[in-house]
């Protein structure tokens, strides 16, 4: 059972449909952390929820605790990287929301843990970022910060090479 996956999905849905506004705090750091769980509309929530679920096989590979730690690590680091980028370049400060930074981080964890064809897969991930520069409403900064956080996670807490080979998302 993918407990962590279902808990995260439940949190995303509850926050989306909640009448409470968790976003307006007095702390910029808290605001950046909370943005990850907000979604612009139902389509955004469904797209991110589906993408996250497709990566939930990592919970089977890593175990519940390590998968939860991985998500929390990527979430916090990518949020802080985004805050640092917006602090360093205030003109780039935009309202960014959504779980996709964490999703991109998990994709990096998956790709870096592949045995064969890892380089080709990573090149595909990098190429997937390019169209985002030409489409409005997509936070490529959030995706890149998530990718960086995923890379840092793999460097600090590597999965055995090939541990995710032949793994597929199961419904």
Swiss-Prot record:
Q: Which Pfam families match?
A: Rhomboid (PF01694)
Do you know which InterPro entries this protein is assigned to?
A: Peptidase_S54_rhomboid_dom, Rhomboid-like_sf
A single GO molecular-function term is: serine-type endopeptidase activity
The primary site where this protein sits is membrane
Subcellular locations according to the entry = Membrane
Cellular component per GO, a single term = membrane
Q: Its domain of life?
A: Viruses
Q: What does the record say about its membrane topology?
A: Multi-pass membrane protein
Respond yes or no to whether keyword Glycosyltransferase is given for this record: no
EC numbers: 3.4.21.-
Keywords in alphabetical order: Hydrolase, Membrane, Protease, Serine protease, Transmembrane, Transmembrane helix
- Membrane-spanning residues where? 3-23, 67-87, 94-114, 119-139, 144-164
Please give the biological process terms from Gene Ontology that the record holds.
proteolysis
Q: What does this protein do?
A: Probable serine protease.
Q: Which family does it belong to?
A: Belongs to the peptidase S54 family.
Q: What is the name of the protein in this document? A: Putative rhomboid protein L523
């Amino acid at each position: 059972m993918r407990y962590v996956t279902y808990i995260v999905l439940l949190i995303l849905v509850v926050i989306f449909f909640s009448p409470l506004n968790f976003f307006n705090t007095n702390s910029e750091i808290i605001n950046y952390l909370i943005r990850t769980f907000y979604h612009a509309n139902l389509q955004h929530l469904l797209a991110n929820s589906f993408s996250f679920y497709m990566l939930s096989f990592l919970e089977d590979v890593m175990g519940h605790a390590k998968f939860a730690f991985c998500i929390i690590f990527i979430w916090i680091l990518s949020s802080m990287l985004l805050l640092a980028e917006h602090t360093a370049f205030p003109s780039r400060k935009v309202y960014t929301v959504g779980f996709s930074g964490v999703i991109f981080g998990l994709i990096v964890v998956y790709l870096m843990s592949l045995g064969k064809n890892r380089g080709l897969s990573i090149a595909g991930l990098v190429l997937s970022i390019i169209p985002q520069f030409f489409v409005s409403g997509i936070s490529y900064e959030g995706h890149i910060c998530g990718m960086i956080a995923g890379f840092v996670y793999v460097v600090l807490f590597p999965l055995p090479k090939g541990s995710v080979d032949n793994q597929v998302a199961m419904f």
